[in-house]
Amino acid sequence: DHRDLHSFPTRRSSDLVRYSYEFDERIQFGLVAEKDVGEPFWNEYHKGYDYYSVHLFLKEMNKWLKSLAIGDYKISFGQGLVISNDFSPGRNALVSQTERRTNGFRRHFSTNENDFFRGAAATVNWKNLDINLFYSYRKLDGGVDSTIVTSFKTDGLHRLVRDREKMHKVSMQTYGGNVRYATPGLCIGLTALSYSFGNYSIQPDPKPYNLFYFRGNRNLNISVDYLLKNKLIKFYGETALSRNGAVASLNALQLTP
């Protein structure tokens, strides 16, 4: 591999192209093209950059359309138990953090090749009600044995033969929605998320750390998130259920004397 790297001088450096256009804070367009160190730019396996990302994001276009995302985007609802592309703090920070305030869709404008959705999403607003719908279809890197996916590859590197053998092997289709009612003192949301992996079944090799990981071809998650507050008390959280039997709940109570 070391000799192979020196036989392609263009592999010794990473390349990044990023273009962004914004108008009146309501229209955002972006393009990202990236090649990691060690990845060829042009050969029989690679044609140009290794990673491309494009998005068009519209905000507050009229009184009903709150947001529209086409291309690559991120999602966050509730406390993130069912779905969130937000940064996740450590355990200690989680205890003292306030409730999440980024509910809805945002553009994906980074070189992270995994933590995003690709498709379309929209938020429609009516009075105190937000209705969010989204659809995504992506090809993921993974270790495949026949129709079994034993692992996912998430580093985004495609330099070696073993990397190329795992590149874009597994299709993932995701769709769902969120309905949110919000007033100054009360907020409640309902989220549903369905995802499937084409003809593949996710079956990671059993290890102590992955005993409770999802296994199978498709899954469904639903959750309810809530926030109740006044001058003295703030209670918020999210409780989620999964079709494979998993249950999760994250709640916090803050008192202000």
Residue map of PLM features:
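Short, small-residue-biased leader/transition segments that mark boundaries at the very start
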Residues: D1-S13
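Surface-exposed extracellular loop regions of Gram-negative outer-membrane beta-barrel proteins
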Residues: D15-H55, P89-S96, A192-R243
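Residues on the lipid-exposed face of transmembrane beta-strands in outer-membrane beta-barrel proteins
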Residues: V17-Y21, V54-L58, I70, D115, ...
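Outer membrane beta-barrel
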Residues: G38, Y45-D141
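Outer-membrane beta-barrel translocator domains and adjoining extracellular loop/strand segments
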Residues: P40-K47, L81-D86, G143-S151, Y200-P208, ...
